[in-house]
Amino acid sequence: MENIFDAKAFLSRVTSQPGVYRMYDASGTVIYVGKAKDLKKRLSSYFRAQVNSRKTEALVKCIANIDVTVTHTETEALLLEHSYIQRYQPRYNVLLRDDKSYPYIYLSADKHPRLASYRGAKHAKGEYFGPFPNSLAVRETLALMQKLFPIRQCEDSVYRNRSRPCLQYQIGRCLAPCVKGYVSDEEYAQQVNYVRLFLSGDDSQVIEGLIKRMEEASQALRFEEAARIRDQIHAVRQVTEKQFVANIGDDLDVISVAFNGAIACVYVLFFRQGKVLGSRSYFPKVPANTSLDEVVQTFIGQFYLQGSAIRTLPTEILLDFNLEDKTILAESISSIAGRKIHIQTKPRGDRARYLKLARTNAATALATKQVEQSTISQRYNSLMSLLEMKEIKRMECFDISHTMGEQTVASCVVFDMNGPLKSEYRRYNISGITPGDDYAAMNQVLTRRYGKSLEESKIPDIIFIDGGKGQLAQAIDVFQSLDVDWDKSHPKLIGVAKGSDRKAGLETLFFKPEGEGVALPSDSPALHLIQHIRDESHRHAITGHRQRRAKVKNTSSLESIEGVGPKRRQMLLKYMGGLQALRDASVEEIAKVPTISTALAEKIFNALKH
């Protein structure tokens, strides 16, 4: 379509103040967001006779309208720009795809505080330690904390309703503050303080405190207690000796980038309280013909300005590249943090060594990603050749999971040229069908998925159905009956039947519900891609089915007991801390739950035991 945007008329009325601009295509979709110190000067650069960037040329051809928002300062413009990028996800902007909040270790503010993994806005009262690069690092640290400092990690509902210590106490991983007489409040508070000091990086103070207590116990002839504290000191020392301690006191993020013109890897190394907390590699979505300067400028802005409320900002940010808006960016991040944050680009000494480490890891991560992308690209090309298709932008796959027809769940997974799009995975609880009728289940999920308006970008090129001719026939019937405003004939429907022994490599592809299928060679890249998407769909369906089955299982055994309605079921599970705790409880313990008489407690006890 010919571009009808009147750039000359638009530029004649644009202000020269700082601000943010949004560019729209003919469909009204925001395709690019930018900021400028001088809006008129910046926007004029897009419409010059000679444009240096091929990306800019492609962008300008798509422009149908431009909106501008004037701001008081460049800092305001920067913050607004990244807010718009996050909201609209424009296709010509560099996008940070992994925008999950970082996990923290949370120490609650209860009388007997608990340790837990936490992700999200910090609304709950307590202390937060981190951020950690991933949930695995948090789980490993929590497991270590249990061995070093045995404070509780159980949910409050379990803690409030214990009448005797749990298994964690028996194996020395908890002091059992839930039951009176096992640990004093003072002793528990002391262990909590050790946790606080240890997670804050003050290992020496922890060891000094433990040594003092060990000596006091020894002098008082409490040799068993002294030996236990001695073992705790040894365990803490073993851990701290293995940790790499940096020669810095403040929090520091070290960032390097590796870029090959198509794929960018931004590697972030986190230092907290002078220790290497971990690292993380990011692969932002980079539009074609994007410069390295734009990649790093946009990444840093999105990384620190978006979601800053749930991220602990460092005192200093060390970069392996020059940043055009370094001063403005530092001011913006500092205003959010409420304290001065420095951005450095030319370090010396130890900091230069950390930057070299980040640079090496960025290059390694990029090389690994390139190999993965090459494999994915090879598989896509093989599949396109097999199906005689010019391009495949989007594929979806469906699977059904149930146990003897109960708690049926259907899954839909989505793949694009880069592999799985996990943010677009969906599960569907299936109801109103004959138990075990997989055809009816497939009919229902496909109707729910496609029997509505779809954006053009959401229409799949291929839909894989996990099943043979019957399931494929069901899918074809559904699509023939659809009454929708998009081209329902566009998706290619393919049935994927497992081999006789359900072994990988023996799959048969069906393109029609009648006739013979096609069996690909076991070393076919196209087959490997199909197996990948089919296995993902299967995994996603089974996980959803197990969750649904577990939810039903947790209440079904109570539903059959006369006199126990929904409110009493909820009350029992809440006060006892779950179904397993209720099963383990005595009649007397069950009778302590509000509204539960002794007679009803006996009935519940007998029903759960038998």
Curated annotation (Swiss-Prot):
UniProt keyword annotation of Cell wall biogenesis/degradation present: no
Function: The UvrABC repair system catalyzes the recognition and processing of DNA lesions. UvrC both incises the 5' and 3' sides of the lesion. The N-terminal half is responsible for the 3' incision and the C-terminal half is responsible for the 5' incision.
GO CC terms of this entry: cytoplasm; excinuclease repair complex
Assembly notes: Interacts with UvrB in an incision complex.
Endpoints of the signal sequence: none
CDD domains: GIY-YIG_UvrC_Cho (cd10434)
BP GO terms, sorted: nucleotide-excision repair; SOS response
Protein name: UvrABC system protein C
Keywords of the record: Cytoplasm, DNA damage, DNA excision, DNA repair, Excision nuclease, SOS response
GO molecular function: DNA binding; excinuclease ABC activity
Domain (GIY-YIG): residue spans on this chain: 16-94
InterPro entries to which the protein is assigned, alphabetical: GIY-YIG_endonuc, GIY-YIG_endonuc_sf, GIY-YIG_UvrC_Cho, Hlx-hairpin-Hlx_DNA-bd_motif, RuvA_2-like, UVR_dom, UVR_dom_sf, UvrABC_protein_C
Positions of the UVR domain: 204-239
Residue ranges crossing the lipid bilayer per the database entry: none
Record family assignment: Belongs to the UvrC family.
One protein family per Pfam: UvrC_RNaseH_dom
Subcellular localization: Cytoplasm
